Amino acid sequence: MKPRSAAPLLSGLLVLVSGCTVLPSTAEKQARTESTRLGQVLHGADQPLPAPHAPLADYLRYAVLRHPQVLAAYSDWQASVLAIAPTRALPDPQLTFEADVTDTLMTFMPGLMFDFMTPGKRRAMADEMTAASSLAYRNYVATVLRTAADVRKAWVELAYADEALNLRQASLRALAQSQELAQIDYTTGRGMGTLSESVRLSNDLAKVRSDIAVLEDRQRAARTRFKSALGLKADETDPAWPEIALIATVLPDEGELWRRTSASNAGLAQMRAMADMARASIEVAKKAKTPDFAVGAMADFKADPLMVRPTASVTLPIWREKIAANIAAAEARRDASVARVSAEEINLAAELAQMLYMVREADQMIRFIEQTALPGYERVIATAEAAYQSGMGSPAMIPESRLMAINMRIERLSALRERELAVTDLLLMTADIAPTDSPLSPKS
């Protein structure tokens, strides 16, 4: 009889607890599903190193699937998604115990206590944590895009170093040929070679050899940077170094670039997620007006008949000034986050204009070199060859003219490098830098 007399009260407590359950929201379910799906992509089969002569997209894909900073950002996002469920859950029940002891045990009263926070308050807290998980996802997206941008910049730098080294080696051959011809002219006295010209060429040769040594160091540094951008440690196998010449990337018009920036920029999306989180925190602050309560029961198993002692408590949110201040502070944080979104949009417009200026400046230089300077040097080379064949000029003029053309090609390569670095920043700004099959949600 005694156990049955306490059963109705215990059953009532369990029914009350089950009725206070807050189910996961649609946003929480979507976040959990998407984090699981992307986790399977990131932690799936080992990603092989790109094959020799692989396109840039293969290197980008390898980096965004393997780089530790991407995996760390994903784990942070996953942790924030998993933290939503504990936020909306009830506190753990408490097993209590009370006894009265004199010479003997007078009362023996175990009990069970449940703390209750209203479903509305826990829903608001869950919504705030869901907004925090959205911010964590935006941080993850920014990390993926930044990783891809680092790979592309390292790729541009490596391609520049390789091509510049080849051009400098061609300069060395042209100078060596000029020096040889000038030395023959000076020694035989049959040409127009002079000692000062021979010395000048020797100095130029030494300068080019020094430039080649610098470029070789630059190439080694670029390869190390490229390997690091891929997420490979120093003691891991080197990747197949890309052997693709730099080419100018075609960009959409300025209006389209701004539309993509406004819609997809990672930094702007982070600011907007922070604003959503600040809005959710206002609802949490408002729910502080709602009291919390606790109910439970204790049963004295020494008493006959069995004595059951119900207990209950309730919080009294009477300090209205404190509640109002917390709400006002949350609203101020929301206003600040909204203002930061506007400030970021203004900054992005200025950055877009600056990046486009750098691209156009490089385009102007490349156009001048390709359409004016290099054709002019080709005519100079043809004239020098014709003069030598007719006996009217020195053969040393031919390699010297070729050297000037090579130097101009190096100038073009430098302009193209600066252009592609600016293009990389533009692609990062518009969130177009990662390959199409990156570990990102379609909504990104």
Model-derived segments and spans:
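Acidic, low-complexity, intrinsically disordered peripheral segments
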Residues: 2-4, 21-28, 411-444
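Bacterial N-terminal signal peptides
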Residues: 10-18
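Bacterial Sec-pathway N-terminal export signals of envelope proteins
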Residues: 20-92, 141, 192-195, 234-276, ...
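A glycine-/polar-enriched beta->alpha junction
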Residues: 61-72, 78-93, 106, 110-128, ...
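Membrane-embedded beta-strand positions of outer-membrane beta-barrel proteins
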Residues: 95-99, 112, 271, 293-297
